[in-house]
Every structure is written in structure tokens, then in C-alpha cells.
Amino acid sequence: MPAVSKGDGMRGLAVFISDIRNCKSKEAEIKRINKELANIRSKFKGDKALDGYSKKKYVCKLLFIFLLGHDIDFGHMEAVNLLSSNRYTEKQIGYLFISVLVNSNSELIRLINNAIKNDLASRNPTFMGLALHCIANVGSREMAEAFAGEIPKILVAGDTMDSVKQSAALCLLRLHRASPDLVPVGDWTSRVVHLLNDQHLGVVTAATSLITTLAQKNPEEFKTSVSLAVSRLSRIVTSASTDLQDYTYYFVPAPWLSVKLLRLLQCYPPPEDPAVRGRLTECLEAILNKAQEPPKSKKVQHSNAKNAVLFEAISLVTHHDSEPNLLVRACNQLGQFLQHRETNLRYLALESMCTLASSEFSHEAVKTHIETVINALKTERDVSVRQRAVDLLYAMCDRSNAQQIVAEMLSYLETADYSIREEIVLKVAILAEKYAVDYTWYVDTILNLIRIAGDYVSEEVWYRVIQIVINRDDVQGYAAKTVFEALQAPACHENLVKVGGYILGEFGNLIAGDPRSSPLTQFHLLHSKFHLCSVPTRALLLSTYIKFVNLFPEVKGTIQDVLRSDSQLKNADVELQQRAVEYLRLSTVASTDILATVLEEMPPFPERESSILAKLKKKKGPSTVTDLEEAKRERSADVNGGPEPALASTSAVSTPSPSADLLGLGAAPPVPAGPPPSSGGLLVDVFSDSPSAAAPLAPGSEDNFARFVCKNNGVLFENQLLQIGLKSEFRQNLGRMFIFYGNKTSTQFLNFTPTLICSDDLQANLSLQTKPVDPTVDGGAQVQQAVNIECVSDFTEAPVLNIQFRYGGTFQNVSVKLPITLNKFFQPTEMASQDFFQRWKQLSNPQQEVQSIFKAKHPMDTEVTKAKIIGFGSALLEEVDPNPANFVGAGIIHTRTAQIGCLLRLEPNLQAQMYRLTLRTSRETVSQRLCELLSEQF
């Protein structure tokens, strides 16, 4: 920047500012400002021409007055005239005034644009920098229309100075954020990608920010940036390289650039090129290794820079979700931060582990830190850290730890910050329902929830507990007994009265045989709460009373007296008065048979998606992550409508889920002839009659298919137009899969038609039913499709998902294999060593055993192997095999027609880098298929 000359001090401006500061009152300040404004007007309108210095001084005074909060309605032309000056300070003040005071509707905008164009064309780097800063500061649509085509040329020009390139990149980024439709993507894109190799730190950092933003909207145009970003990142983090070593910040080389490069890589799936992928893995391993090294400085700047790179690397590992070893290492590293003395680090570790808990590969590793997280919930002083601890407990919850986590959440709820109580209530309700093996525990949990935090229990929660009690015969008597006992407390929350009134009205007869809960006692107990409740609750209790008339004829007279009282028949509330009159008349004139018909027990509710999860998402607020990304990061989307509780030994599912049950499978397996129940209308069969019309499988489809053998959620397919994400869950022979179709472009997809294609053999063995989707998918939007699945018999093939649509007048046709494999219906079974080997010997016929010896395709890591076997669906049996290095598993394949017991044994040979896998089942085809699927994972 040019040196400021002696005359640029502007003493008059300093005196004016001093006068303003010395004013004793608001009136004195306004008087001084008006005096100065009159002086400036006279100077601007005078016959004597002002020199550049005077214009600059007076424009600065006007700018200062404006910043004090006073309107300025003159001086704009003088500021524009300063833009034509060849003196840096005068031009600088002109641009400053324009950036702050001139709006896009000004009559001077054309003159301003001409001055900016002249400076951009001047090739004077200082003037070009001022012009670019002004464009970015104003950032209006008009500025984008005028200069969006010029700035890319400056950015990629070979003779542009580094400082100007940096400003041009940031200016273009600002315009793209303000008006993305006006920034053209053209020939310059390939050249701007190569700025990632620039040796100037400012240029490459600004270019990375620009490319990251552009790649989110136009991934195909910038896909070459992946290899360049990996290469540059490798040169930075590898100690042998000297790239940007001059930009080391507290012993961390170029930390800001490293973070931006890692963020850029999160715009894309894992690299397909093995060399690039291997190099990226080396980079991530190097970053994780450096995190384990002793700190090179005790200063906070060193740890901040080092941890910033580490956390962004962990975000990339989680985003790719394809390297089990890295995921487990990342989890272990974060576990060390959970007890760090720095609060911010503990917060970030908890937040990152929430995401890692959604991966099949790292979920078990996250669960090992449960005691530390529970301790954080109890001892952390910062409420935001405690909230993250709640989120992590919710994310790591599965059947093995659900009761412990729910108990801890309930304990914390009594002292929780009021701002997060409703969210915790919703999470407890979701977890209690999803992982309820014993539904008496579920009832106890919800009633305890109402007792502790009744004011925060929404209607969705107590509606849901009533639905589940009505749908489950085995819990109705217990629920009636429990609510009766709870209502005997001197002070009951109104929500408990609602639940108690409804349940006793339906099932009070189940406990009426006990003298302590006789019909009259039940009525008096409920009526003692009547006058303390709001109108809606009183209306519900009146309905309970008329139900009692049907259930217990002996209390009919007592209830009629209550309904006949003036407080009811002449109630000021119309609803209560109408109910009292109608119920009284009904109890008087209706015969016993009619009364029994009108007031019969409520039928089971249709199984449908619970609204509790939707309530939780609404409570959490809008997310910056797209639903398709959530498909990768979350485990499930809806709440179970009350499935049959499984035996404790076989209740664990292969894919733990912190969110909610996707399966609305009902209280019994669906009737084979009919479709599964649904809240969204009739289901339609989408088996294609013309599979020949489908496109060949998309590149990488087989690899993505193999990745989903041991996982249920993630991104199945992605190209420049379309992203397909999956969320799925299976229980016994039933499953439900949600497919998310995301439009990555800004243009509508028309005639959007997804079709499932199955061979004749597969159709006979696998039942698939789905709902149609909207044929129009807006740009940047996503649509969801649910697929209900039933395994009729064992199968070997997988269905193909074919998507056809029109994009920009062009017909698009994409086919991918849908990862529905036999092991999805694999339920784990715990067995003692003696039982295992006894069963192993029983399955000794040659046709019952399949064995495969194969070379390891991935690093032979014990923890990763365990995670894959559990993800495959088998129980991992500890201390069964005499050789502790071997892995032994057991489970049952559930189909509609049969249940097939399965035993497996995996023997690793570390020296030879080989595995021997043995499968024994009662059916040869099952042994063969499971062996094929599992051997591909190692």
C-alpha cells in the first residue's frame, strides 16, 4: 500500500471528531453536526473548485456523521468523483463512502460501475484491490450482473498479482453467495481448480473457499479438485515435505488451509482412484498420529490449530464412512478429549462422537465411553456441554444399554436446564418405545417421565403411550394397575390424570377384582382430580365416567348424580355441558346391549409413524445438513408402532440406532396375502414388467452394494445430478427401508419414476412393497420413498433400483443394486461354549458346511473385524473358541417359511494375511450365500 503523505492526516476531521466527543448533551451534538453539515454544503456548492484533499476530508466527515446515526442526503457525487482520483487515499475514501452509503437503486450506480470497471482494467494492483473490495462489500445483485463475468478472467489471468488473485477469489465467492445464478460456470473452472497448487498461501486459501462453495452446487464441474486437494494436503501434513513450511503457525503447518482442504473433500464421496484414496488415507492417518504426539508448545494457539485440523479430519472420516480402521481410531482419539480440562474440547468431542455413533463401524467403539459421558452429564457446569452429552447418549443407545441410558436421562431430567427439558423428554420417550423388550418397563418409564417433567410432556408423548397400551393385550392390566397407583399421590400432574383417565376407562375392569381398586374406588380417585383440571381434561374424564357406566353397572347411579349436578348440566363451558347432557341421557335411555355397543373398548390403533420424532426434529430446529446427509449420519427415522418384544438373548439388532425404530411392524407378523399397514394410503407393487428397459448398473454400484452388507444407512449412489441415500432397519423376517432421492441441481426433475426390478426367483422369495413418489423433484430438494420388505424364503440375488427422469429436456436412466441381502434377516443368538460346539457337531454333514480361504483385502484389525461380524447380523461369542485369535458367531436367519440356525467361525492368519471362513447351517444355499457375503468384507 502506498505510504500516506503528510497532508493525509486530515486535521479538520480530527478536530470535528474531538468536538463531537466533547459535547455534553445530545442537543449539543446535533447542533455541532448541523453546523458542520451547513459548512460542508456551502463548500460543495461554492464557486471555488475543491481539491482532492478537501473533497476527501469533507466526505470523511459525512461518513462519520452517518455512522453516528444521522441521515446523509448529499455528497454522493463528490464521493464518486474521488473514485477517479489517481491518489490512493482519495480513491480509498471514495470507495469507502460508496460501500457504506450508496444503495443499488442510486442514480449514480452507472457512474460507480464505470469507475470500478476502469480500475479493474487499469492493471494497477492497488486500484484493482480497492475495486474488488468495493464489489464484495456491496455484494448486490446489480454488482453481480455487472462484474460476475469479469472477475473470473482476472482470477485466472497469468499476469495477475497474487494479492489481486486472492481478492478476486473472495469477491467471486461473495457474489456467488449473494446471487448464485449470476456467477457463470465455464471454461475458467478448470483453471481455477489448479490454483490449489499455487505457492501463495493467500491465493490457495481463498481459492479453496471458492471451490468448496462452487462444488456444492456443481460437483461434476469441480471433481478434478479432489485429487489436487489430496495432493496438496499430503504435501502439507507429511513431515518430509517442505510445502508451505514458511506458513507454520505454532508448529502446525498451514492449519487454516488444511482445514479448508479437508472441508472441500467433504463435498465428494471417497475417491474412486485407489492411488488417490490411499494417499488420502495416509494423510488422515498422519493427522491422527500427530494428535497422539506430545505437544510441541504449551501455548493455547498450538493446541487450537492442531485440534482444528484434527476435528476436520474426523469430520471427513465420518463423511466417507468407508474406512473402519480410521473410524475406530477417530473414536478413540475423541474419547481422550472427553476428560480434557478444556471445556470447548469436551464439547467438540461429544459433538463429533454423536456423528461417529451413526456408523456401524464405530458404534461399538463409541459405546465404550458410556460411563465417561454419563459422568459428564452429572458433573459438567456448562449446560451446552451437558446437552451434547444427552445427544451422545441418545446416539449411542441400543438394546444392550437402553435401560441404563434412559435411567440416567430421567435422573438428569430432574435438574436439567429448563431450555432443554422438552427435548430430553422426547428423546426418553423415543428410546423407551424403540428399545422396549419388556413393555411394563416402557409404561413405568413414561409415567415416571410425566411425574418428573409433566409440564414438558407434549400431547404426542401421552397419546403414544395410550396407543401402545391399547395395541398390546399383555400390558393393559399392568398399565391400569400402575396408573391407578400413580393417581393416589396427593399431587398428580394433569398429563398423568389424562393418561390414567383414558386407561382406566378402557381397562379399569382388569383391576376391579382387587378390593383396593374397586370400581367405586377408581371413580372416586379420578373424580377427586376433576375440579383441579383444565377443561380438555375434564372432558376426557367425563368420557371415562360414561365408560365406567358400561364397565361397572354398580356405579351407574353415582355417576348419573355427578352428570346431573348443576355444575355439569349448567356448566359455562359448552363442551362440558354438552357432554354431561348427552352422557346422562345415554346412560338413562340406552339398553345394556346398546350401551355396550356404543361404549365398547377402543380397537387397536392402525400402525403408523409416530409423531414424536417429528416433534423432536422440530424442537431441534432447522439443520444445516441435508436430509440425504442425515440418511448417512442418522440411524433411523420413525418410531416403532409396538413390535413384539423379543427374547433377551436374541433381542439385539445388528444395527443399533439412536433415533427411532423404522419398523412399524405391528404386534404380529403381517398376513402374507395383504400389504403391511401404512398411514400413507395404499401400497403399490413396483415390480417392473419390462426389466429390459432399465439401464446397466451404474459405475461403482457393486462396490457400494458390498459396503452395505454390514451397514444399513448411508449414501448408496451419487453423481452430478442425483444422490440416493438409504435408511433401513430389519427385525426377524421383516424390514423397512427409506430411500431418499436428492436433486443436486437447481433444475427440476420431471417424470421422476423409481422402479424396483426383481427376477422371477427373487419375487418368489422376497416380498417388496412401496409407495409411489412425486413425479416432480424440485432443484435442491429431496423426496422419500418407503419400501416394506418381507423375506419369504432364502434368496441369493438382490433387487435392482431403476430411476428414470427428465433433466433439462434430457432423459436420464440410472440403475443401482439395492442392498437387501440375506444377512439382513440375521438375528443374533447368544450361546454358551458347550451349546455352540454341540450344535456345531450336529451340523457336520457336507451339504451343511461351506468353507472359504481367501486373502485379506483390508488391514487385519481385530476391532474392525468384530464390528463387521456384528454388523453382519451375528452375535459375537466371546471365549468360545480355544484360539483367542479366532472369531465365533451365531444367529438365526428368519424367513416366513422357516428359521435357519447359523454358526460361523473366522480364523485369521496374520503372517500369511489370509482368512479361513466356515459357515454351518441347516440349509446349503444359506451357508453358501452367507459365506459369499461375509468373505467379501475382509
UniProtKB/Swiss-Prot annotation:
Low complexity: bias regions: 645-668
Organism for this UniProt entry: Bos taurus
Stored InterPro entries: Adaptor_Complx_Large_Subunit, AP2_complex_asu, ARM-like, ARM-type_fold, Clathrin/coatomer_adapt-like_N, Clathrin_a-adaptin_app_sub_C, Clathrin_a/b/g-adaptin_app_Ig, Clathrin_app_Ig-like_sf
Positions annotated to bind a 1,2-diacyl-sn-glycero-3-phospho-(1D-myo-inositol-3,4,5-trisphosphate): 11-12, 43, 53, 57-61
Protein name, as recorded: AP-2 complex subunit alpha-2
SUPFAM superfamilies associated with the record: ARM repeat, Clathrin adaptor appendage domain, Subdomain of clathrin and coatomer appendage domain
Organism taxonomic ancestry: Eukaryota, Metazoa, Chordata, Craniata, Vertebrata
Tagged with keyword Transport: yes
Ranges for region Disordered: 616-677
